[in-house]
Every structure is written in C-alpha cells, then in structure tokens.
Amino acid sequence: MKVGWVGDCVYVIGDYGGFNITTKTSVENQTAKGWYDECFVTYCDPAGGERIQEVPGGVKANNSVDAGIDYIIALIERGKFFVCKDCTGVLGEIWDYSRDENNQIVKVNDHYMDAMRYAIFSAVTSGVVMA
C-alpha cells in the first residue's frame, strides 16, 4: 500500500497484493515497481514475525484495529480521504469492511483494508501501539 499526505488529506495512491506468495516474491515485485525508497518506512503486519526483516525499511505496524478504523472513518467523514481509481484491491474491499451484530469487525476479504490501516494509522501514531 502506498499512501501519501498533502496537508491533512490522505491519498491512497497504490496497492499491491497477492495470495500465497512469499515475502521474498512480494518484495521482489514491489522493488521492480520502484516501491521501496529509503525515505519511506514500510509498516508490516505485526504478526509477520521474522518476515518483517525481509522487507526493506520494514517495521511493525500499529495494529489497533478499532482506533485505526475510527481514524480512517473520521478522514472520510471530513472529506480528507481519497483513493486512486487504480487501487483496485482497496476499492474492491472497502465496501465489504463491516461489523457483526456484536459490533466486532468481520475478518473476511480484508487484506488490503488491513494494509491501508497499517499504513495510515501507523504513520499518524508514529508506530506507537495503542492498547
């Protein structure tokens, strides 16, 4: 997920994903696309363990699900959140993000949503994990 800020607006400008591919293959594909730049931190799924070390600039993301979702919803409500039309992974999942009858996040078809939340919320909290 590539995310950028202009002022207080957040722009999702690129997404990349694949199923059942290794971290090495993912990194190679993203490197070929020019995604790794020394000036960017790469926030990774904290459950990734040692695989995070395989990602250039990889650090554990803030995985505070509810706080991260609430932050992104607030951006959307204020008109401060934009997604590039080429981000088909994000656009394909964003409307599926939902809660069940107990107000718990439904964990299905959400890989891009998790990546987006990691990128946006980890950056604004400087990687601080909120409990």
Identify the function of each model-found stretch.
Residues 7-107, 126-127, 131:
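Mg2+-dependent endonuclease catalytic cores in nucleic-acid-processing enzymes, primarily RNase H-like
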